[in-house]
Amino acid sequence: MLQQNNEQLLNLLPDKMMEKTFNPTDIEQSLYTSWEEQGYFSPTGEGDSYSIAIPPPNVTGSLHMGHAFQQTIMDTLIRYQRMQGKNTLWQTGCDHAGIATQMVVERKIAAEEDKTRHDYGREGFIDKIWEWKEESGGTIGKQMRRLGNSIDWSRERFTMDDGMSEAVQEVFVRLFEDDLIYRGKRLVNWDPKFHTAISDLEVENKDKKGHMWHLRYPLANGAKTAEGLDYLVVATTRPETMLGDTGVAVNPEDPRYKDLIGKQVLLPLVNRLIPIVGDDHADMEKGTGCVKITPGHDFNDNEVGKRHALPQINILDKDAAILATAEVYDTKGEVCNAYDTGLPSEFAGMDRFVARKAIVAKFDELGLLVEVKDHDLVAPYGDRSGVIIEPLLTDQWYVRVEKLAGPAVDAVKDGQIEFVPKQYENMYFSWMNNIQDWCISRQLWWGHRIPAWYDENEKVYVGRTEEEVRANNDIAADMKLRQDDDVLDTWFSSALWTFSTLGWPKDTEDLKTFHPTDVLVTGFDIIFFWVARMIMMTMHFNKDENGKAQIPFKKIYMTGLIRDENGDKMSKSKGNVVDPLDMIDGISLEDLLQKRTGNMMQPKLAKKIEKLTRKEYPEGIEAHGTDALRFTLTSVATTGRDISWDMKRLEGYRNFTNKLWNASRYVMMNTEEFDCGQSSPEGKAGDMELSLADRWIIGQFEQTVKTVHEAFDTYRFDLASQALYEFTWNQFCDWYLELTKPVLFKENEAQQRGTRHTLVNVLEALLRLMHPIMPFITETIWQRVQPLSDFSKNGDSIMVQAFPQFDESKCDQQAIDDLEWVKQFIIAIRNIRGEMDISPSKELPVLLKNVNDNDQRRLDENEQFLSSLAKLESITVLADDEQGPASASAVVGDLSVLIPMAGLIDKEAELARLDKAIEKLEKEAGRVRGKLGNENFVSKAPAAVIEKEQAKLADAESTLAKILEQKIQIAAL
């Protein structure tokens, strides 16, 4: 009898085992709700701990294929370890996503209320964001449930919740007290639209058609080049920044200019004397060999400036317009008087690109414009604002990371933290060994406000609260303090993710139990922005009972990117984004077109995307269910490589779920109302007799268990999926189920009982083996199969059962060898049928030659299997000297299998049919050869198209060779 709690799950699964196809929409959402309500996702408190912290998705986001891919891997690991008896925690939560969230809400109030954030003021606008989060911020959580993620939702965190805010403040204050945080003026990526510094990850570099301007800079004090010229020609793609030049670099080995090093040029328009410096940054082979150096508006120039102590001049305001008066700083960002701050008044207030035209025109007017060349360049754009980013000198807060980087490098070097695959360690070391101080301030309203206050003299005080600042510094209540307006970089709070979500800075039981986490599953693109910073922050703030720095995770599993079928990156602007929920539930063509083009402002692009979508999905997208999607994702999870999404693969794995479903229907129909051996628990001798096929499938299953364990333990989810597919489809369904039919239709109760017992027990264990990847279908079938099996359950859901363990004693090598021989014998007969176009249902006489003792034993023991599955009329063993009639033949080991052809085929008709097939294939092969021999086609066609044509030719030639061989055989009859 099923237990009462188990009935709750069964009630969700209407008795549909006899339906021909599995319909995932019938059960997925209700089954997930039941799992969640019954608390199966929560830690049990028993066993060794195993934990994963999810990379927190943006609160503004919705599920994309990258999320689906990584989360399927994480859930597979969590379910696997839970079934291994571990005390599992999958910690989830969302990131407040500073700039992205602020932008979403700004757009919302502009569209709905015709207001800006300034109309609300800072506090009012932040209230609007919290309102928006309550209404819309949970979308991604609902979508994650659809993936089957076994997350303990009661522990969900948000990077702006009270506990996280406390942790962020604590970290900032302690770092400041340790002299690891400072405020300084340095060059940052400045977004002139959003008026904030942004990280490198938020900069999108795009190819762009531009120009290279060659400008003449007069040499000062009568200096001349080796060629006798009294000027240098500099080449630049950004002539507007020349107003901020503080040097000209030449290569110290360049014979044209090396004697000028230490001399000066008179900078046109501003009449500023600036030095000529020797630096390898100047390439003798590139441009004119002379490079203008603008430390205040170019990152490379800034490094050159530091090497040669060149002042930094800022010529732009926060809107990237020309200032009336320049700002001059030394290399440390301190104000200095190295140069006059005057700028030409005619350019003041001009946008940088308007100023570019005006400055070029002025150079032309003065006879200082040498030439303008077309030039392909890469320009940095804000990924959200869409405007060109400006390197700008601004006051920002920074973390001194050099001291933090050392232990973080050592943790990977000494094996405390392991990258999977290992090759990513080199990328990590490369970045860590050249690490720059981290700019952590952002000029936004939404985020963790920097816990720093200023008095009327701009002296800065850092503390957890204003009250603490006043108390620690004896500041009177009537003395006004102003809190810093900036907020912290989103990556600052997410760098604390693994330990802050477990209650730090308090010393909680969760922190002791689940930290460090076991594995981080993430993409290589954020090794620097998140992974490295998590390691640095965690090791600085967390120590074990012996005072040793604690790591955030033991392993880092790096995934590749999911790309479209052509290998291109998925993006809304390309219209090639695949929504995982559309793969699960299906979507009509009309709805898909609306989703991809509905909000597009560019009609031409929308038209192009519509055409592409109609071609790719003429009927829309069919529903495939969550299990098929998850199995597809694990099957392509080769370590670290990018993946081209393939709808055909997804369709293939939907067919796989149907195959499993139908196999289970067969098992249930042949066992549910019958004695499967479980009625004799004392196991009396003679109760059950296992056939060769039973012993073979049990051994094959054990080998599959071993392979899946090894694959999961080494993060080779692709190999685990491959092993499960191979066993389920090819061995269990295609062979074993067919081999059970002769036994089940015989009148031998012991053999029938043995086969039924094997059917239910192998299927039950197979469902547990597959469950981490395919949770829904396995739970559904397991609820019905388990009561028929020997397996003693622990709890009511498959997810809390024991994962199968490899048992070598169940691997009967002789049974495996014998059954493989039986399979090869049957395949040989089937191949002859196929080659000779003989009906599969026609019973055939078979003659055998070269039969050894082992072959004879196998024939005697398995005649029932051979006759049934190969559809044989008779099996005759020929004497050694006996010649058989004209026959089609095949070889199984040393054994020759002959099928006499007399009376089986119409020789002339078959030869005529083969001649037609040969003619057709020769034409096709000739056509493709001609195409591939066409130089014009080969030079212009994409590599994928050429590969497709080459595959066509190989297929045609292979088939042609087989048919020609077949023709020779038939002609000889």
Swiss-Prot record:
Where can the motif 'KMSKS' region be found?
569-573
Short sequence motif named 'HIGH' region, residue ranges: 57-67
What is a single Pfam family found in this protein's UniProt entry? Val_tRNA-synt_C
Q: Which GO terms describe its molecular function?
A: aminoacyl-tRNA deacylase activity; ATP binding; valine-tRNA ligase activity
Instruction: Give its E.C. classification number.
Output: 6.1.1.9
* Keyword Glycoprotein attributed: no
Tree of life domain: Bacteria
Keywords assigned: Aminoacyl-tRNA synthetase, ATP-binding, Coiled coil, Cytoplasm, Ligase, Nucleotide-binding, Protein biosynthesis
Q: Name one GO cellular component term.
A: cytosol
Compartments where found: Cytoplasm
Q: Which reaction does it catalyse?
A: tRNA(Val) + L-valine + ATP = L-valyl-tRNA(Val) + AMP + diphosphate
Entries under InterPro entries matching the protein: aa-tRNA-synth_I_CS, aa-tRNA-synth_Ia, Anticodon_Ia_Val, M/V/L/I-tRNA-synth_anticd-bd, Rossmann-like_a/b/a_fold, tRNA-bd_arm, tRNAsynth_Ia_anticodon-bd, Val-tRNA_synth_C_sf
Using the record for this protein, list the coiled-coil segments as residue ranges, or answer none.
901-970
Assembly mode: Monomer.
Family assignment from sequence similarity:
Belongs to the class-I aminoacyl-tRNA synthetase family. ValS type 1 subfamily.
Biological role stated in the UniProt entry = Catalyzes the attachment of valine to tRNA(Val). As ValRS can inadvertently accommodate and process structurally similar amino acids such as threonine, to avoid such errors, it has a 'posttransfer' editing activity that hydrolyzes mischarged Thr-tRNA(Val) in a tRNA-dependent manner.
Q: What is known of its domains?
A: ValRS has two distinct active sites: one for aminoacylation and one for editing. The misactivated threonine is translocated from the active site to the editing site.
Protein name according to UniProt: Valine--tRNA ligase
Tell me which species this is from.
Answer: Colwellia psychrerythraea (strain 34H / ATCC BAA-681)
